[in-house]
Every structure is written in structure tokens, then in C-alpha cells.
Amino acid sequence: MKGIFIAFDQAHKDAVISALDKLNCRGFSFIEQLQGRGSKTGDPHYGTHAWASMNSGIITMVEDNIVDKLLEALKNIDENAEMLGLRAFVWNIEQCY
């Protein structure tokens, strides 16, 4: 099992949730307002007067065979609007109940 943390511009919310739905990734936790900036490109997302946009985040746990498909779907969303920003990070999950 893998944990995937997805940070994205709020404009991507519907597309990200749709990608999860299409792969039957039902369970996730959603963080509506998440501040940050990309490590390489893109504008900061601080929700301030100067940097008005905001990020959101989703963390989900998926079976190993879903990871590559989900990452591909997320990459496609990002590439269609690169300046908005979207990144996904995968962690090994040792145990859960």
C-alpha cells in the first residue's frame, strides 16, 4: 500500500477528485487551504494580496497497482495548465487499520 500526497492549485480540485474517482480511489482526506510554492517553477500560493492564489491538498492511500495510473492522470492535469501547479508525492505505508 502507498500513501500519495497531492498538492495542487485550487482550480484543479474537480479534475483531481475526478482522477481519483475514475481509479476507484474512494478514501481521501482533503485540505482546502494549503499555502506553498514549488521547488522549481511557478508562483507562490499564499492567499495574500501579493500572491492571491491558494493550494489545496489531498492525501490518499492506494494499492500499489494504482500508483502509476494515478500519477499519470495527475501529470496530465498538471501539463494541461502548468502555471497553476500540481505535485504528487508517494510514500510507503507500513501498516494501517
Language model features: what each stretch is:
Residues M1-Y97:
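Positively charged, small/polar-rich N-terminal and surface patches that mediate targeting and assembly
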